[in-house]
Amino acid sequence: MTEITVNGMTCTSCATHVKDALEKIPGVNAAVVSYPESRAQVMADTAVSHNQLLAAIAALGYQGSIRVGDFKDEPKIRDALEGAGLHIAIIGSGGAAMAAALKAVEQGATVTLIERGTIGGTCVNIGCVPSKIMIRAAHIAHLRRESPFDGGIAATVPAIDRSKLLAQQQARVDELRHAKYEGILDGNPAITVLHGEARFKDDQSLVVRLNEGGEREVTFDRCLVATGASPAVPPIPGLKESPYWTSTEALVSDTIPARLAVIGSSVVALELAQAFARLGSQVTILARSTLFFREDPAIGEAVTAAFRAEGIEVLEHTQASQVAHVNGEFVLTTGHGELRADKLLVATGRAPNTRSLALDAPGVTVNAQGAIVIDQGMRTSNPNIYAAGDCTDQPQFVYVAAAAGTRAAINMTGGDRALNLTAMPAVVFTDPQVATVGYSEAEAHHDGIETDSRTLTLDNVPRALANFDTRGFIKLVIEEGSGRLIGVQAVAPEAGELIQTAVLAIRNRMTVQELADQLFPYLTMVEGLKLAAQTFNKDVKQLSCCAG
């Protein structure tokens, strides 16, 4: 293998051009080029000279120099050699699909990417990005109306123009979609994009019904299914006949309803419920059980208390048995009487987009919910077909999808990489936020792990005291005996900003004492992790502000 330092590349497209130029040289079997590392690795016959390689790079306007030494990542070029010449079909264009497409090209494959709707998938278009923009706007409105500093900063009733907020939101969505999805695909000559709906013909070919009309058959060596998921609709009589909202419609509404009913008790339902409440809606949440009923009970209790303090009505153990829409008004029949609202948001989960794929043709196994069953390498029951993201039985987070897509591409081109989710962080963007990683106590006990735990309320965290906002807690779960940290649950303003430290601690198998011994910057929320760790053998109320 020959390794070359390449100076002058400014983007991934530059790396693609260098790769193409090198692989056009007779005798070059494969090349891997990395723009961030300013490096090319070339596997070639002995007849290929260094001067030939450097000349091909120079012809593109870049400067190359041969690197001398032992190279430890030779498997990367070996993978590319196996991937060279492969044709990979990818169904979808979201986080998993994009990560897989770019990695597959890097590994030497050519890619046909098929998208039936808008390029970019859920996250950038109708999920993470627009919802977080709306949540941020609602947070600003809330602070203008009410803050811990109202005694010295006069509170005001904000004048909210939802149409202008929506225009700002969608402009950023369009900008990110073009910069991170459309522009990247357009600039990569190894990726062909088809706009249409794909279904399997067999385990080596797809039929694509093109949006512009007609059909096209696409053959492949390997295929990745990354079709995502859509809002699930519960079987409530009358619901489908009514103009209810899912998160998709709620995020693009240009008005704020006076009364909003929300069916759901987890992430999407609660994030949007609070956002609409802060923008002016009177919100009522119908929870079949309690809020966040799958998590540690303290999480749901803390968020419920915070919501009720803001005037959001939370009806626990309440289900709608009938939905009607009469004279522009929703009427929900519940066990506690009728509930009336101007709009109804249904956010009870998401269902995988797999029904139209004809997965039975290649014999791909799905579970009872229609999610594709995969192993840690994203392999399905058919060796030619892989899957990643929300259409599978993995956790539905875009960063999990992207990591899965990358590993799927490596495995489709001859590698062997697994996705390890033992220290997977999760964040809910309510206020206070909810952030978790690893085991809850109940989950650990279910797996036969004996635990010890401590819960630190935020009135013991200097940053929270300085903010005059002590809502929430940080809970650490450790393995009894070893003292190893195995789980963290946090409810706190900006809890999402502290959880990654806990991820690294768990990933590196730190004990709670090792965590307590680390240096944490004073007056940061993440310092709460150190204080929580100290509670296993100290009373932190008796410590000075920044006691080590």
From Swiss-Prot:
Its cofactor is FAD. Resistance to Hg(2+) in bacteria appears to be governed by a specialized system which includes mercuric reductase. MerA protein is responsible for volatilizing mercury as Hg(0). Disulfide bonds join 123-128. The active site is a redox-active disulfide bond. Residues 1-65 form the HMA domain. NCBIfam families: MerA, PRK13748.1. Homodimer. FAD binds at residues 97, 117, 122, 132, 198, 390, 398. Pfam families: HMA (PF00403), Pyr_redox_2 (PF07992), Pyr_redox_dim (PF02852). It catalyses: Hg + NADP(+) + H(+) = Hg(2+) + NADPH. Belongs to the class-I pyridine nucleotide-disulfide oxidoreductase family. A metal cation binds at residues 11, 14. Binds 1 FAD per subunit. The gene is merA. The keyword rRNA-binding does not apply. One of its GO terms (molecular function) is NADP binding. It comes from Pseudomonas fluorescens. Hg(2+) binds at residues 545-546. GO terms for biological process: detoxification of mercury ion. This is Mercuric reductase. It comes from the Bacteria.
